Amino acid sequence: MANNNRKNIKRLLFGEFSWKRLMRSIIFIYAFLCFYAFFFSEGLIFQPPSSSQNDSREVIKINSANGLKISAIHFPNPQAKYTILYSHGNAEDLDGILWVLREIRDSGFAVFAYDYQGYGTSQGRPSEYNTYRDIDAAYNYLTQQLGVPAKQIIVYGRSVGGGPAIDLASRQSVGGLVVESSFVSAFRVLTQIPILPFDKFVNIDKIGKVRSPVL
């Protein structure tokens, strides 16, 4: 009697088990996951820190491809042969990495770093596509305004910065590429195999197109 009561309660709460019902549930969960990943994933990928940073005389304003201004910093080094084009991590901004940039300069390189749209004092909102625009703007400023030869630019990407760094290096003949703590793709940070019909920062597909030395 007690077993029958338990079965009746389960049937009321969960319904009769069937493979059709199970498949419908799996399809619903998968569709919800796709919807959430497509519309809300960039809010998880990009986490701009709260910053009290103000534009100082060190800060350069450059135009991204969509017309918005992003902030950049250039630490020249007259003795340096190479310039590091630095793309920072998802929870960093220029104000928080100044010490890193100075250490790189003091180790024998010139350094050019920038904030993605929505970071620091850069205008706009961060997105995968906007990071590609932003690194292009930084690269163009280096080569066109500062006259740095492409072969003397080493592109450095840390964490999410590996995405724009790899993307640029796959399209331009730069002097080298350094990738630190990055990922094969954004969604495969959580899953070892691709389970969604789309992805972001698919670095694994681009790294093979890089013809420069990679570290």
Positions of PLM-derived features:
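Short gly/ser/thr-rich secondary-structure transition/capping motifs
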Residues: 63-70, 195-200
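Membrane-embedded segments
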Residues: 65-141, 145, 151, 163
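Short glycine-enriched, charge-decorated loop/helix-capping segments at active-site entrances
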Residues: 125-128, 192-197
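Proline-centered loop/turn at the N-terminus of a beta-strand
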Residues: 110, 152, 175-176, 213-215
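Primarily recognizes the serine-hydrolase "nucleophile elbow" in alpha/beta-hydrolase
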Residues: 138-146, 150-195, 206
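An N-terminal hydrophobic leader/cap segment in hydrolases
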Residues: 18-64, 71
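The feature captures the conserved acid-bearing segment of alpha/beta-hydrolase catalytic domains
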Residues: 195-215
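N-terminal Lys/Arg-rich, disordered targeting/topogenic segments
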Residues: 1-17
